[in-house]
A protein has these predicted regions:
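S-adenosylmethionine/decaboxylated-SAM
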Residues: 6-173
């Protein structure tokens, strides 16, 4: 099974922080959520996913399937529920719940349209602390993600975008 969070966990383990606070935009089937929480005992994680039907790069994702994903995700992370909060909403509606420069990392793996990835970058980048990790998934495999991330990076003068073997893109703020 492929879990996109493997590359992210390796990066976060390099920090010397006693406590980590982060956001996962797009929790999906919960594999990455579980991996983050089980691998990083010092992590408080906020998940943002509306679990509603939508069309994306991989076709139609019916609401019934996503409702099943929600149930599975919550069952998987039950042992870690004291360190996890799920906002069942779209990322645009949740961004104001977080103070600027309050988070150690953000992992963007939600709606993969060019417009939404760019908007998530613009909305959530200010939430990262200086020295925090700004990251996401599907940089090499989905053109819309690649274009949006590259455009945003250029806009804020990020000259190098790091990548892991698990197709996680990142840079340090």
């Amino acid at each position: 099974m492929f879990i996109s969070g493997y590359g992210l966990v390796d990066l976060l383990k390099l920090t010397d922080k006693k406590e980590l606070v982060g956001i996962e935009l797009g929790c999906g089937d919960g594999h990455t959520t579980l991996h983050l929480l089980s691998s990083l005992p010092n992590l408080t994680l906020y998940g943002i996913d509306p679990y509603i039907g939508y069309d994306d790069f991989n076709g139609h994702n019916p609401a019934e399937m996503l409702a099943g994903n929600l149930v599975n995700t919550m069952q998987k992370i039950d042992p870690y529920k004291d360190r996890f909060t799920l906002y069942r909403d779209i990322s645009d509606n949740v961004v104001d719940k977080f103070e600027n420069e309050s988070l150690d990392f953000i992992f963007i793996d939600g709606l993969h349209s060019y417009e939404q990835v760019l908007k998530d970058c613009e909305n959530y980048y200010p939430k990262i602390k200086k020295g925090g990790l700004f990251s996401g998934h599907d940089y090499r495999v989905i053109d819309s993600v690649n274009r949006a991330v590259n455009e945003f990076a250029a806009k804020i003068n990020v000259s190098e975008i790091g990548e892991t073997q698990n197709d996680v893109w990142y840079w340090v703020k």
